[in-house]
Amino acid sequence: MTAMGKSRRMRRSVAAGACVVAVAAVLTGPAQAAADSGGAAAGNGGASTYTKGLGWKLKPSGAEVRFRGLAAVSRSTAWVAGSKGTVLRTTDSGASWANVSPPGAGELEFRDIEAFDRKRAVVLAIGEGEASRVLRTEDGGKTWTEAFRNDEPRAFYDCITFFDSKNGLAMSDPVDGKYRILSTSDGGRSWRVLPSEGMPPAQTGEAGFAASGQCLVSHGRSDVWLATGGGATARVLHSKDRGLTWTAAETPIPAGDPARGVFALAFRSRTQGIAVGGDYRADHASPKASAVSRDGGRTWETSASPVPAYRSGVTWVPHTKSVALAVGPTGTDVTVDGGRTWKAFDTGSFDTVDCAEDFGCWASGEKGRIARLEP
């Protein structure tokens, strides 16, 4: 979900400083009406509040579909992907959105998108058999090329990630008892299924959740993590060699049901990670729905003060050591201590969240909702 584009060092420093001050204000300042900031509230029915510093500002998309795929390129540029084969792109900070959906894709369900810049993006459609596809564009969505169409009836692809502009992976629910991994080394132009010998067996009923495009995430040149649910325990699988071999670790996030498990991961380094999830059913509680790892995903512990409900998306705020955002149907939470404790600061519904290197943080979800984090 994260864009590959980079910004200049000075811009990073300024953005990081503003971020730290603003997020601290979010946690310590009194709530105030969104109208005070002169923008539209991102919460439900206008009931959401902005606190001192930052808040979500809705960026009307003109669409009614659900956007579970999101790639933040910068504060000005973002891509979203969703149901009914819909892909939108903004290059003016969300003031307008161009419909750049692939022709003839109306029956596809896009759940993940990776953008390298304002021109190049790779989008994943999910579903059984041929419904799982990968498409790519190099001209801002004017034209699209189908790069992969699944021909295994039992495969169901959930998420996609890139290490850089050339190398990436996609993951499918288990086939013959093991997760299936696709690999590309040419920016998504071609894909191959990796050997399964290095993949540990899946648990009975275990699968990934195509809820936010964050069930498969990477950091650096070769580390990648895979989130699971539906089995007896919610696990995180880790590969240090771009998907050739994997190790599995149990998390304390509740599982044991097809609706429960780890829905999203975020790693700010090879060692420091956050997992969020829970039970996506609105009438079921989600205690212990967030966990942290300090050893690259080998071990996980429940947050001392977890997110208050099911969360489907999570992202680190760039250029900080301990600030992250988590989103779900009932709101947004922020942590300033690396995931140990979380505090809610918005009640609007979002499925996924992503931050660019220049501190352009975006969120998207149901009914065409897209927002950017702003003062």
Name every feature range the model reports, one short phrase each:
Residues 10, 22, 38, 205-206, ...:
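Exposed boundary/loop context
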